Amino acid sequence: LKNLTLAKLKATSGQKSKMKSVQNKASKSKIIVLDPGHGGVDPGAIGRQGTYEKKIVLMAAKTIKKILVQTGRYEVVMTRKSDQFIALRKRVAIARRAQADLFISLHADSIKNGAVRGATVYTLSENASDKEAAQLAERENKADLISGIDLNAESQEVTDILIDLIQRETMNQSAVFAGAVVQELTTKIKTHRRPHKFAGFAVLKALDIPSILLEMGYLSNIEDENLLNTKSFQKKLAFALLQGLDQYFFKGQSFRN
Protein backbone atom coordinates (compact mmCIF):
# COMPACT_ATOMS: atom_id res chain seq x y z
CA LEU A 1 0.00 0.00 0.00
CA LYS A 2 2.78 2.40 0.86
CA ASN A 3 4.45 1.86 -2.54
CA LEU A 4 1.15 2.43 -4.35
CA THR A 5 0.51 5.53 -2.27
CA LEU A 6 4.00 6.87 -2.98
CA ALA A 7 3.43 6.38 -6.71
CA LYS A 8 0.13 8.23 -6.45
CA LEU A 9 1.76 11.02 -4.47
CA LYS A 10 4.53 11.40 -7.05
CA ALA A 11 1.99 11.58 -9.86
CA THR A 12 -0.08 14.18 -8.04
CA SER A 13 2.97 16.11 -6.93
CA GLY A 14 4.28 16.02 -10.49
CA GLN A 15 1.12 17.72 -11.72
CA LYS A 16 1.43 20.26 -8.92
CA SER A 17 5.11 20.88 -9.74
CA LYS A 18 4.32 21.43 -13.42
CA MET A 19 1.62 23.95 -12.49
CA LYS A 20 3.95 25.75 -10.10
CA SER A 21 6.75 25.69 -12.68
CA VAL A 22 4.50 27.44 -15.18
CA GLN A 23 3.52 29.99 -12.53
CA ASN A 24 7.17 30.61 -11.61
CA LYS A 25 8.17 31.08 -15.23
CA ALA A 26 5.38 33.59 -15.64
CA SER A 27 6.29 35.54 -12.50
CA LYS A 28 10.06 34.95 -12.85
CA SER A 29 10.36 35.08 -9.08
CA LYS A 30 10.20 32.83 -6.04
CA ILE A 31 7.66 33.65 -3.35
CA ILE A 32 9.23 34.15 0.08
CA VAL A 33 7.14 34.77 3.18
CA LEU A 34 8.92 36.77 5.89
CA ASP A 35 7.41 36.39 9.33
CA PRO A 36 8.48 39.03 11.89
CA GLY A 37 7.72 37.27 15.18
CA HIS A 38 5.49 38.55 17.97
CA GLY A 39 3.86 42.01 17.64
CA GLY A 40 1.06 44.00 19.26
CA VAL A 41 0.28 42.81 22.77
CA ASP A 42 3.09 40.25 22.48
CA PRO A 43 6.44 42.08 22.77
CA GLY A 44 8.56 38.94 22.60
CA ALA A 45 11.90 39.15 24.38
CA ILE A 46 13.04 42.42 25.94
CA GLY A 47 16.76 43.19 25.85
CA ARG A 48 18.92 44.24 28.77
CA GLN A 49 18.87 47.79 27.40
CA GLY A 50 15.14 47.77 26.71
CA THR A 51 15.06 46.63 23.08
CA TYR A 52 11.77 44.97 22.12
CA GLU A 53 12.06 41.85 19.99
CA LYS A 54 8.85 42.69 18.12
CA LYS A 55 10.35 46.00 16.90
CA ILE A 56 13.76 44.60 15.95
CA VAL A 57 12.37 41.73 13.88
CA LEU A 58 9.97 44.03 12.01
CA MET A 59 12.82 46.41 11.17
CA ALA A 60 14.95 43.50 9.98
CA ALA A 61 12.11 42.06 7.91
CA LYS A 62 11.64 45.35 6.07
CA THR A 63 15.38 45.54 5.34
CA ILE A 64 15.47 41.94 4.13
CA LYS A 65 12.39 42.44 1.95
CA LYS A 66 13.90 45.48 0.25
CA ILE A 67 17.13 43.67 -0.58
CA LEU A 68 15.40 40.51 -1.83
CA VAL A 69 12.88 42.36 -4.00
CA GLN A 70 15.58 44.55 -5.56
CA THR A 71 17.16 41.47 -7.15
CA GLY A 72 14.05 40.75 -9.21
CA ARG A 73 14.36 37.08 -8.27
CA TYR A 74 12.07 37.15 -5.27
CA GLU A 75 8.58 38.27 -4.40
CA VAL A 76 8.20 38.88 -0.66
CA VAL A 77 5.05 38.61 1.44
CA MET A 78 5.17 39.71 5.09
CA THR A 79 2.91 38.22 7.74
CA ARG A 80 2.77 41.62 9.41
CA LYS A 81 3.85 45.10 8.29
CA SER A 82 3.17 46.95 11.52
CA ASP A 83 3.05 46.44 15.29
CA GLN A 84 0.11 44.04 15.34
CA PHE A 85 -0.56 40.66 16.90
CA ILE A 86 -0.90 37.78 14.43
CA ALA A 87 -1.81 34.31 15.71
CA LEU A 88 0.69 31.57 14.90
CA ARG A 89 -1.77 29.54 12.84
CA LYS A 90 -2.68 32.63 10.84
CA ARG A 91 0.99 33.21 10.00
CA VAL A 92 1.17 29.73 8.48
CA ALA A 93 -2.15 30.32 6.70
CA ILE A 94 -0.75 33.50 5.13
CA ALA A 95 2.18 31.52 3.74
CA ARG A 96 -0.09 28.83 2.33
CA ARG A 97 -2.44 31.39 0.79
CA ALA A 98 0.53 33.10 -0.86
CA GLN A 99 1.67 29.71 -2.26
CA ALA A 100 5.04 30.40 -0.70
CA ASP A 101 8.16 28.64 -1.91
CA LEU A 102 9.83 29.28 1.46
CA PHE A 103 8.82 30.58 4.88
CA ILE A 104 11.30 32.48 7.09
CA SER A 105 10.33 33.44 10.64
CA LEU A 106 12.49 36.11 12.31
CA HIS A 107 13.17 36.27 16.05
CA ALA A 108 15.73 37.50 18.60
CA ASP A 109 16.38 35.11 21.49
CA SER A 110 16.76 35.77 25.21
CA ILE A 111 18.11 33.45 27.91
CA LYS A 112 19.42 33.78 31.47
CA ASN A 113 23.07 33.38 30.46
CA GLY A 114 24.01 36.82 29.15
CA ALA A 115 27.31 35.57 27.74
CA VAL A 116 25.67 33.45 25.04
CA ARG A 117 25.40 35.15 21.66
CA GLY A 118 25.14 34.56 17.93
CA ALA A 119 22.54 33.67 15.31
CA THR A 120 20.81 30.28 15.20
CA VAL A 121 18.70 28.67 12.47
CA TYR A 122 15.93 26.29 13.55
CA THR A 123 14.07 23.71 11.51
CA LEU A 124 11.28 21.41 12.61
CA SER A 125 12.24 18.20 14.38
CA GLU A 126 10.72 14.96 13.16
CA ASN A 127 9.51 13.90 16.59
CA ALA A 128 7.70 17.16 17.20
CA SER A 129 6.10 17.27 13.79
CA ASP A 130 4.79 13.70 13.58
CA LYS A 131 2.35 14.27 16.43
CA GLU A 132 1.39 17.69 15.14
CA ALA A 133 0.67 16.29 11.67
CA ALA A 134 -1.77 13.79 13.14
CA GLN A 135 -3.54 16.49 15.14
CA LEU A 136 -3.77 18.76 12.12
CA ALA A 137 -5.19 15.96 9.99
CA GLU A 138 -7.99 15.49 12.51
CA ARG A 139 -8.81 19.18 12.97
CA GLU A 140 -8.45 20.61 9.50
CA ASN A 141 -10.23 20.01 6.24
CA LYS A 142 -8.01 17.57 4.40
CA ALA A 143 -8.19 19.45 1.10
CA ASP A 144 -6.95 22.62 2.81
CA LEU A 145 -4.19 20.88 4.75
CA ILE A 146 -1.95 20.12 1.78
CA SER A 147 -2.27 22.63 -1.03
CA GLY A 148 -2.92 21.11 -4.43
CA ILE A 149 -3.58 17.56 -3.18
CA ASP A 150 -7.19 16.64 -2.35
CA LEU A 151 -7.34 13.93 0.32
CA ASN A 152 -11.07 14.03 1.00
CA ALA A 153 -11.74 10.77 -0.83
CA GLU A 154 -8.84 8.88 0.75
CA SER A 155 -8.95 6.47 3.67
CA GLN A 156 -7.34 7.45 6.97
CA GLU A 157 -4.46 5.04 6.33
CA VAL A 158 -3.70 6.52 2.90
CA THR A 159 -4.07 10.04 4.29
CA ASP A 160 -1.58 9.31 7.07
CA ILE A 161 0.96 7.90 4.61
CA LEU A 162 0.59 10.84 2.23
CA ILE A 163 0.98 13.35 5.03
CA ASP A 164 4.04 11.51 6.34
CA LEU A 165 5.70 11.44 2.90
CA ILE A 166 5.00 15.10 2.17
CA GLN A 167 6.09 16.16 5.63
CA ARG A 168 9.38 14.30 5.42
CA GLU A 169 10.19 15.88 2.06
CA THR A 170 9.32 19.33 3.43
CA MET A 171 11.52 18.77 6.47
CA ASN A 172 14.37 17.61 4.25
CA GLN A 173 14.09 20.71 2.07
CA SER A 174 13.92 22.92 5.17
CA ALA A 175 17.17 21.38 6.42
CA VAL A 176 18.84 21.89 3.02
CA PHE A 177 17.87 25.57 3.01
CA ALA A 178 18.94 25.96 6.65
CA GLY A 179 22.36 24.55 5.75
CA ALA A 180 22.75 27.08 2.94
CA VAL A 181 21.78 29.96 5.25
CA VAL A 182 24.09 28.82 8.05
CA GLN A 183 26.97 28.60 5.57
CA GLU A 184 26.42 32.24 4.59
CA LEU A 185 25.76 33.50 8.11
CA THR A 186 29.02 32.09 9.46
CA THR A 187 31.00 34.19 6.96
CA LYS A 188 29.21 37.44 7.81
CA ILE A 189 28.17 37.53 11.47
CA LYS A 190 28.66 35.80 14.81
CA THR A 191 26.74 32.53 14.96
CA HIS A 192 25.92 30.23 17.86
CA ARG A 193 28.36 27.35 18.43
CA ARG A 194 25.54 25.08 17.20
CA PRO A 195 24.08 27.26 14.45
CA HIS A 196 21.50 24.74 13.18
CA LYS A 197 19.06 23.31 15.71
CA PHE A 198 15.75 21.44 15.58
CA ALA A 199 12.61 22.33 17.55
CA GLY A 200 8.83 22.16 17.39
CA PHE A 201 7.99 25.80 16.67
CA ALA A 202 4.35 26.15 15.57
CA VAL A 203 5.19 28.45 12.66
CA LEU A 204 7.43 25.75 11.15
CA LYS A 205 4.62 23.22 10.89
CA ALA A 206 3.29 23.94 7.40
CA LEU A 207 3.35 20.46 5.89
CA ASP A 208 4.05 21.59 2.34
CA ILE A 209 6.24 24.72 2.70
CA PRO A 210 9.95 24.45 3.60
CA SER A 211 10.42 26.69 6.65
CA ILE A 212 13.14 28.00 8.93
CA LEU A 213 13.13 30.12 12.07
CA LEU A 214 16.08 32.51 12.32
CA GLU A 215 17.04 33.67 15.78
CA MET A 216 19.12 36.66 14.69
CA GLY A 217 20.95 36.95 17.99
CA TYR A 218 20.45 37.16 21.75
CA LEU A 219 18.81 40.24 23.24
CA SER A 220 20.07 38.92 26.58
CA ASN A 221 23.60 39.66 25.34
CA ILE A 222 24.44 43.38 25.27
CA GLU A 223 26.80 43.08 22.29
CA ASP A 224 24.16 41.25 20.24
CA GLU A 225 21.49 43.70 21.35
CA ASN A 226 23.58 46.64 20.14
CA LEU A 227 24.26 44.96 16.80
CA LEU A 228 20.62 44.01 16.24
CA ASN A 229 19.71 47.69 16.48
CA THR A 230 22.02 48.67 13.61
CA LYS A 231 21.14 48.84 9.91
CA SER A 232 24.57 47.49 8.98
CA PHE A 233 23.97 44.27 10.93
CA GLN A 234 20.48 43.87 9.51
CA LYS A 235 21.90 44.25 6.00
CA LYS A 236 24.47 41.54 6.72
CA LEU A 237 21.62 39.25 7.76
CA ALA A 238 19.70 40.19 4.63
CA PHE A 239 22.60 39.40 2.30
CA ALA A 240 23.26 36.11 4.10
CA LEU A 241 19.63 35.14 3.52
CA LEU A 242 19.79 36.33 -0.09
CA GLN A 243 22.86 34.23 -0.81
CA GLY A 244 21.35 31.27 1.02
CA LEU A 245 18.21 31.61 -1.11
CA ASP A 246 20.25 31.89 -4.30
CA GLN A 247 22.20 28.78 -3.33
CA TYR A 248 18.98 26.88 -2.60
CA PHE A 249 17.04 27.90 -5.70
CA PHE A 250 19.73 28.70 -8.28
CA LYS A 251 22.70 26.54 -7.32
CA GLY A 252 25.61 27.06 -9.69
CA GLN A 253 24.46 30.45 -10.96
CA SER A 254 26.20 33.68 -10.04
CA PHE A 255 24.54 37.05 -9.53
CA ARG A 256 25.83 40.56 -9.05
CA ASN A 257 23.37 41.26 -6.24
Predicted regions and their residues:
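Catalytic-core regions of hydrolytic enzymes
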Residues: 4-158, 167-179, 239
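Active-site-adjacent mobile loop/cap segments within catalytic or ligand-binding domains
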Residues: 162-257
